[in-house]
């Protein structure tokens, strides 16, 4: 038996962004991310020790750093113990703000959200062909995390209109989760995940921003998804997504309960039709403050791949 080992170190540029705005209320800036790290790999161990170094020029906090550490130990075939500590910058450009809340508005230029640390330990196992299990738990700390809250927009005529204001606050959470995946010969696949989080946002101010920052945070998330290929050209899927919210000052936002189904049929190479039905249970819930989700709703279309 021949053992193999890989050892190496690198200093690489992880990302670089040059952002120019035409809006006079927003400053142009350049951000640079470096990722020095050391790697060691052999038949049983995978070790990575490094750091994520983020610098900003023109706007934002000038220097931030987070760990980039990962350790895996394969103590038996398809049984893995692992630990990791990650982090890094999440750039709050217009694209991310739109994804976070398409109805929200900012009153001033937001700084980048910084994941100071996301540390976890876990166990992965594949006790049977096509079956994978993953159990994990950890801690996450976010600086300048995004949140939204109701506010009033004052016009030039001193009239007020309701709006969603996007703000930032420091948050943290302890989490534990599990995942199971199974696949059979590209005919059937099943996945189920569940994550519990206990959030905290320390707030000594009078604005109550810390409480607002947690109102829509997920306390428990669960996802179930099934894909079936009865024939190679046809894909059918069924899924369920549940999100219960953090309890804040004795109250909780209604949980998300979305049962959905869909399908995709490729009738020519690269050309397919698709359809999806959401909220089959016709539940009343919100993803964004003050914007109720539609009841049973349907989307469909044609997809072209080149």
Put a short name on every predicted segment:
Residues 1-4, 36-38, 123, 127, ...:
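Hydrophobic, Leu/Ile/Phe/Ala-enriched alpha-helical segments that form helix-helix packing faces
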Residues 1-8, 12-13:
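Single conserved hydrophobic/aromatic residue that forms the stacking wall/gate
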Residues 15-31, 63-72:
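Helix-rich catalytic cores of soluble enzyme domains
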Residues 13, 46-48, 54, 58, ...:
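Exposed, low-structure sequence patches enriched in small/polar residues
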Residues 10, 17, 25-56, 187, ...:
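Surface-exposed extracellular loop regions of Gram-negative outer-membrane beta-barrel proteins
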């Amino acid at each position: 038996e021949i053992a193999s080992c890989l050892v190496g170190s690198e200093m690489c540029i992880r990302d670089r962004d040059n952002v120019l705005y035409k809006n006079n209320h927003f400053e142009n800036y350049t951000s640079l991310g470096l990722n020095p790290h050391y790697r060691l790999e052999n038949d049983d161990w995978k070790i990575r020790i490094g750091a994520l170094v983020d610098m900003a020029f023109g706007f934002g906090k000038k220097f931030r750093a987070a760990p980039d550490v990962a350790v895996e130990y394969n103590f038996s075939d398809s049984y893995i113990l692992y630990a990791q500590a990650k982090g890094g910058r999440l750039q709050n450009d217009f694209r991310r703000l739109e994804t976070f809340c398409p109805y929200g508005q900012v009153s001033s230029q937001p700084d980048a959200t910084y994941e100071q640390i996301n540390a976890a330990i876990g166990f992965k196992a594949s006790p049977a062909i096509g079956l994978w299990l993953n159990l994990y738990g950890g801690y996450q700390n976010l600086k300048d995390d995004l949140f939204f809250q109701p506010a009033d927009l004052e016009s030039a005529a001193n009239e007020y209109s309701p709006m969603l204001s996007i703000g930032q606050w420091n948050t943290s959470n302890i989490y534990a989760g599990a995942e199971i995946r199974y696949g059979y010969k590209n005919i059937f696949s099943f996945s189920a995940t569940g994550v519990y989080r206990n959030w905290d946002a320390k707030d000594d101010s009078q604005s109550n921003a810390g409480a607002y920052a947690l109102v829509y945070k997920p306390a428990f998330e669960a996802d179930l998804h099934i894909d079936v290929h009865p024939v190679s050209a046809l894909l059918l899927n069924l899924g369920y997504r549940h999100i219960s919210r953090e309890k804040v000052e004795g109250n909780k936002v209604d949980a998300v309960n979305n049962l959905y189904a869909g399908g995709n049929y490729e009738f020519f190479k690269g050309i397919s039709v698709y359809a999806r039905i959401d909220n089959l249970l016709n539940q009343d819930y919100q993803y964004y403050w003050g914007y109720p989700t539609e009841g049973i709703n349907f989307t469909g279309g044609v997809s072209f791949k080149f």
